[in-house]
Amino acid sequence: MRLFTHGQVLALLAFVNTISATPSFSTNSYPAHPAEPVSLFSQHQPQAPLGLWTRLRNSVIERVWGVPPQQRHRGGNKHQYPPFSAPASLRARYGDDVVLRFKLQTADEVKALVEASNILFLDVWSSTDEWIDIRLAKDVVPSLLGLLPKSLQTTHVPLIRDLPQTIYESYPSPSQSPSGRERGFLPSGEPSSDVTNIFFENYQPLSVIVPWMRLLASMFPSHAQFISIGSSFEGRDIPALRVGVRPANDQKPRRTLIIEGGSHAREWIGVSTVNYVAYSLITSYGKSKPISTLLEQFDFIFIPTINPDGYVYTWETDRLWRKNRQETSLPFCPGVDLDRTWGFEWNGNATGDNPCLESYGGDKPFAGVEAHQLAEWVKEQTEQRNTKFVAYMDLHSYSQQILYPYSYSCLYQPPNLENLEELAMGIAKAIRLTNRKTYAVSSACGGLMASQKKKAKPETFLRMESTGGSALDWFYHDFGVKYAYQLKLRDRGSYGFLLPRENIVPTGKEVFNAVMMLGRFLLGESNAFQELDWDAGFQRPKKDDKPILNDDDDDDADTNDDGIGRKDDSWIPDEYKGDNDRDESDGGWAFRRLRKR
């Protein structure tokens, strides 16, 4: 049990009192037409008093949606609660939008779909060499099909038939249950296991995340520090946690890893996952020898969202907003894609010159304010703070992929390709042994599905959007970070960006184990770390004590240990049912020992 000094306790109490005296954050701006309230019960139900953090979360939901305290709905979890219709404001904004998946076979099909999506200004959700997911209104479907070759007119399937309803169910629901677990919202001295911490039972708005980060740092000051990377276009801090224990007399450059999420505002699972990994490392220090060793050897910079303006906008106005919120040359098309604005090979595919495009990278390199702030921060840390950045992990969604450089072109290979692939394969296997989830491994230029079923088709490398100017390429090429990856998290399309909240903890476990594998790889084969029981540091799935580092295949298990699944999946095409539970053969994914020192 952790002991706090008298001064720390007083500071903590003062902080909590400040929050409890503030029912909501008045600095937030809320939509002009909030969602209509939906009543769960027809008659009044007695309620137990709600605790501090639930009141804080409820106040955010009430202010955003305009829901009176006595008329809170319990949407956001259709697996446990009865379904409710999406409010009129969501129907008005998203209409009868759907998400369709198109299967791709030839380069001509890719080219036709690229041209059609640009003509109709469609929202491309995800793309690989096998399929492309596109959001569009139902009444636009005939126009799209009319622009496509016959081969594509019959090879599309619906992934989301009712987008407003799915969006409505993705928002967290204000709790009306007794507050017996309220203390679970606060950081504790125990590492997170399963869903014991209420913070990870729902996606959280920025106005809850930032106080939580500050409190976490105040409770573990020996190895956690709350910092700001810079300021966003709208003046918000870009919050981060620095986690690590640096020896007082160590004059060597401090090896540092960056774990970042939320570049694209609508990808909420990346934000929650960064927080989960940070929480797990911080609360496990001193209890797990492998984790303690990592924090003594490295600093970790956790940035839940580099795009705070966009993230707030997804909570208050448009759940599917992708870019940041800065002004462009067209007043009616604001925002810059923060993963297409970096300086290396900026706008490499020459398709991002239209501010209305989702992948618009700005009118010059580093036009995106927040990307420029992060680039300047890492330069300052290197030049003035004796820091050496050795790894970069950028969390996105969706499609379950582990991508390494380069993104801008498939014609060039990174010099340490073998090492990048080896580590990526080790990360993929650690994830698969966590929750039976298969993550593809590929170069980011194609975003290929590494199913091992067929070889990549170079002629299909024509992309649906610009892939130049990515953070992945800049950190690797211009900044010299040897191990740079982009992880596209769950799922493979059943929910896309609207991943249900039940996936927060399982996805967090997967990426936590990925970070552990990354740290183990970076420590290398030094004799000083030979005796560490690395498996003790990994988070295991429920009802399974199989070691994460076991090199044996485990392909005979086809169940989901986390119990995550869709109860009503009758509308899903048969070929996509259980697409998150496929457990394909390892192929060549064994964690090889071939890297060159």
Curated annotation (Swiss-Prot):
Cellular compartment(s): Vacuole; Secreted
Signal peptide: 1-21
Propeptide residues, chain positions: 22-174
Keywords, alphabetical: Cell wall biogenesis/degradation, Disulfide bond, Glycoprotein, Metal-binding, Secreted, Signal, Vacuole, Zinc
GO cellular component terms attached to this protein's record: extracellular region; vacuole
Cofactor stoichiometry and binding remark: Binds 1 zinc ion per subunit.
Stretches with biased composition (Low complexity): 170-179
Residues bearing carbohydrate: 349
Cofactor(s) listed: Zn(2+)
Cystines in this chain: 333-356
Compositional bias (Basic and acidic residues): 563-580
CDD domains tied to this protein: M14_CP_A-B_like
GO biological process per UniProt: cell wall organization; proteolysis
Alphabetical list of InterPro entries matching this protein: Peptidase_M14
Listed GO MF terms: zinc ion binding
Positions of region (Disordered): 170-189, 543-597
Stretches assigned to the Peptidase M14 domain: 202-522
Biased composition (Acidic residues): 550-561
Residue sites binding substrate per the record: 264-267, 322, 339-340, 397-398
Ligand binding (Zn(2+)): 264, 267, 396
Entries under Pfam families matching the protein: Peptidase_M14 (PF00246)
Function: Inactive carboxypeptidase that may play a role in cell wall organization and biogenesis.
Family label: Belongs to the peptidase M14 family.
Name listed for the protein in its UniProt record: Inactive metallocarboxypeptidase ECM14
Species name: Ajellomyces capsulatus (strain G186AR / H82 / ATCC MYA-2454 / RMSCC 2432)
